[in-house]
């Protein structure tokens, strides 16, 4: 209602609102969230004991008043905000997190699938849908920090799409705000999550639910040809120059590439005068 929606997750609200509009049935959403939290805090004790014994659980023996940032500590948000809602039957989960784990993407790559498996085990409803959001563009650079951290987390989130069964990922590269870690366009994020649910959970055929995702590339003399999943209907740049692609030769130095759509706009060909014999490609990395 207007009286209580202001304190609710905007992304979750727009997700449920779009589902209700399309399905024409009430859609209930439980919001369990804490801004700026680390994934470690959303994982239960058993996962750490069995799979990650190297991660300390000493926080569990501390006096609560001595814990300055519970959202950073292993198990605490799981204990307080996930375990109590296990009694509810759910259709699926949406997840928007990752910004606070920039410092160690490879650990995130292990923890994220482990968390999803543990939640599914807790609910005992099989591999229920798990749709998540790739972190948005923002100048995450911190003092003495590696400027590639955000790109590495996004890459890990993309790779987790293959590690987590019955999962979907929403890309936000086009709707972020480089100067604000909380981009205002939550409606697009919620709708994109809803499209995954409509297509894969509610089996609404014909629903386009994902933007193009990198599949593979091949080398053709001076060109690199990039193929994508979810591009069967063709891609578009809306008559604007395609920017962000770079290619490199054997020296490993990347240069901006000219990108052209072809093959019914399902593939991209890349060239650069500075790279006559390309061997590698990257996009916005």
What are these regions (language model features)?
Residues 1-285:
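Cell-envelope and extracellular/periplasmic
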């Amino acid at each position: 209602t207007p009286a209580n929606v202001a304190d609710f997750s905007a992304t979750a609200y727009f997700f449920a609102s779009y589902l209700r509009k399309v399905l024409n049935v009430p859609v209930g959403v439980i919001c369990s969230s804490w801004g700026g939290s680390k994934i470690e805090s959303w994982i239960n004790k058993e996962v750490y004991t069995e799979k990650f014994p190297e991660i300390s659980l000493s926080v569990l023996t501390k006096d609560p008043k001595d814990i300055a940032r519970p959202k950073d500590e292993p198990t605490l948000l799981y204990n307080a905000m996930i375990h109590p809602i296990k009694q509810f039957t759910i259709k699926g989960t949406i997840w928007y997190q990752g910004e606070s784990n920039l410092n160690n993407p490879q650990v995130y790559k292990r923890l994220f699938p482990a968390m999803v498996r543990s939640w599914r085990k807790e609910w005992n409803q099989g591999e229920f849908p798990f749709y998540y959001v790739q972190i948005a563009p923002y100048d995450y650079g911190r003092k003495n920090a590696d400027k590639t951290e955000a790109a590495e987390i996004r890459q890990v989130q993309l790779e987790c799409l293959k590690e987590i069964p019955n999962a979907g990922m929403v890309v936000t590269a086009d709707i972020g705000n480089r100067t604000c870690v909380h981009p205002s366009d939550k409606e697009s994020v919620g709708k994109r999550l809803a499209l995954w649910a409509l297509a894969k959970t509610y089996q609404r055929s014909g629903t386009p639910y994902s933007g193009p995702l990198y599949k593979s590339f091949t080398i053709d003399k001076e060109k690199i040809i990039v193929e994508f999943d979810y591009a069967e209907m063709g891609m578009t740049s809306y008559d604007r120059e395609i920017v962000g692609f770079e290619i490199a030769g054997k020296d490993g130095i990347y240069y901006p590439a000219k990108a052209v759509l072809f093959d019914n706009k399902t593939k991209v060909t890349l060239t650069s005068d500075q790279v006559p014999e390309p061997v590698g490609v990257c996009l916005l990395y």
